[in-house]
């Protein structure tokens, strides 16, 4: 018997998206499921739909099918068989019953603890050079009194009488498809299958207590504002013997009055006098690594940028060192002596006699 095209089975084109494939499968699986459909060949159609979905929902199988069809090198993709595969019947109807699907997570299975986040504020230099600090964080740890069981010492948990220890109960519901028996978590034991008859007086049956835990955190040199550090296994304790979560330390860096940060580079503005810019000078520039000498060539213009190699921040991942960029700004004096004013007037007079750039610009604007 020749197999129908899988896209034809689901009523889709070959360019259908994953979401369209999933929706088509759900619709047809509801229609042909043997527990619902009264059609004579419902079982065969359901298996056909399930097989088509199993192939088209898998990227690798779908690509192979698109290239070779049913006669491909791995013809016969599985499919058919039981009503397992992609979605179970309980999954299909979960939207009607509030999510009581078949693939429930075992509440007694080991689970990783929750991750925690801690905010820390550093000074500018601390972020550049790194720091080691001890932080106190509130965590939920297993109760020492009951060893995390939640039961009073000397007692133990009992099997839930309502679900006989299975953690699930059967509930009958009327649906558009008829009366359906739905399995859902037992409300008496929260799906654990166990009940605590006598609760621990310290943790009141939760098995956990709130504590403040001291943790040593190493801040790497070169960390920047907004970056975070992961401290493995320092989050909330795991559940049912599962591993602990992680701690994420989010770093905030205070602004500096003189320096600014751009990645691994440090930027600063250096005020110098008109005379230093015109005549040239050697000035002392502060860096996070100490003061350094910087030569200002004669005739330097305000806004000129100088590079101090290797005077920036270290790369937080260890890939070298940034630089410091010094932008010079002329400082115009606000108070002058009579002698200084006379010197400037004399200088200004000499400038007017020169065929300077300013005169050329002036003539250009006048159209001369």
From Swiss-Prot:
Keyword Metal-binding: yes
Family matches, as InterPro entries: DnaJ (IPR012724), DnaJ_C (IPR002939), DnaJ_domain (IPR001623), DnaJ_domain_CS (IPR018253), HSP40/DnaJ_pept-bd (IPR008971), HSP_DnaJ_Cys-rich_dom (IPR001305), HSP_DnaJ_Cys-rich_dom_sf (IPR036410), J_dom_sf (IPR036869)
Entry binding sites for Zn(2+) 2: 160, 163, 186, 189
SMART domains recorded: DnaJ
Record Gene3D superfamilies: DnaJ domain, Heat shock protein DnaJ, cysteine-rich domain, Urease metallochaperone UreE, N-terminal domain
Keywords per UniProt: Chaperone, Cytoplasm, DNA replication, Metal-binding, Repeat, Stress response, Zinc, Zinc-finger
Cofactor: Zn(2+)
Zn finger limits (CR-type): 130-212
GO molecular function terms noted in the UniProt entry: ATP binding; heat shock protein binding; unfolded protein binding; zinc ion binding
GO CC annotations, alphabetized: cytoplasm
Compartmental location: Cytoplasm
Positions of Zn(2+) 1 binding: 143, 146, 200, 203
Limits of the J domain: 5-69
Per-repeat ranges for CXXCXGXG motif: 143-150, 160-167, 186-193, 200-207
Complexes and interactors: Homodimer.
Note on domains (UniProt): The J domain is necessary and sufficient to stimulate DnaK ATPase activity. Zinc center 1 plays an important role in the autonomous, DnaK-independent chaperone activity of DnaJ. Zinc center 2 is essential for interaction with DnaK and for DnaJ activity.
Family: Belongs to the DnaJ family.
Function: Participates actively in the response to hyperosmotic and heat shock by preventing the aggregation of stress-denatured proteins and by disaggregating proteins, also in an autonomous, DnaK-independent fashion. Unfolded proteins bind initially to DnaJ; upon interaction with the DnaJ-bound protein, DnaK hydrolyzes its bound ATP, resulting in the formation of a stable complex. GrpE releases ADP from DnaK; ATP binding to DnaK triggers the release of the substrate protein, thus completing the reaction cycle.
Name this protein carries in UniProt: Chaperone protein DnaJ
Organism in which the protein naturally occurs: Bacillus mycoides (strain KBAB4)
């Amino acid at each position: 018997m020749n197999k129908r095209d899988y896209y034809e089975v689901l009523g889709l084109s070959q360019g259908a998206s994953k979401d369209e494939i999933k929706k088509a499968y759900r619709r047809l699986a509801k229609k042909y499921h043997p527990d619902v459909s009264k059609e004579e060949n419902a079982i065969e159609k359901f298996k056909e739909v399930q097989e088509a979905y199993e192939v088209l929902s898998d990227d690798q199988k779908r690509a192979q099918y698109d290239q070779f069809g049913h006669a491909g090198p791995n013809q016969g993709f599985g499919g058919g068989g039981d009503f397992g595969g992609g979605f179970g019947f309980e999954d299909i109807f979960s939207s009607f019953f509030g999510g009581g699907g078949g693939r429930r997570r075992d509440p007694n299975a080991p689970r990783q603890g929750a991750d925690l986040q801690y905010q820390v504020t550093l000074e500018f230099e601390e972020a550049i050079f790194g720091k080691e600090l001890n932080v106190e964080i509130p965590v939920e740890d297993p109760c020492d009194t009951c060893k995390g069981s939640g039961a009073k010492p000397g007692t133990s948990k009992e099997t839930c009488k309502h679900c006989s220890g299975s953690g699930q109960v059967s509930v009958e519901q009327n649906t558009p498809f008829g009366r359906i028996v739905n399995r859902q978590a037992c409300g008496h034991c929260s799906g654990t299958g166990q009940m605590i008859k006598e609760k621990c007086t310290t943790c009141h049956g939760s098995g956990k207590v709130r504590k403040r835990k001291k943790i040593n955190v190493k801040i790497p040199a070169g960390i920047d504002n907004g970056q975070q550090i992961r401290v493995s296994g320092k989050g909330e304790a795991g559940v049912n013997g599962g591993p602990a979560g992680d701690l994420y330390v989010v770093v905030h860096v205070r602004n500096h009055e003189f320096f600014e940060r751009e990645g691994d580079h440090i930027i600063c503005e250096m005020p110098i006098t008109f005379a230093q810019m015109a005549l040239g000078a050697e000035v002392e520039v502060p860096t996070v690594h100490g003061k350094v000498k910087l030569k200002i060539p004669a005739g330097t213009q305000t806004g000129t940028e100088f590079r101090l190699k290797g005077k920036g921040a270290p790369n937080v991942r260890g890939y070298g060192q940034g630089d410091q960029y010094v932008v010079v700004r002329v400082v115009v004096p606000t108070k002058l002596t009579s002698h200084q004013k006379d010197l400037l007037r004399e200088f200004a007079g000499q400038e007017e006699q020169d065929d300077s750039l300013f005169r050329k610009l002036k003539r250009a604007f006048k159209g001369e």
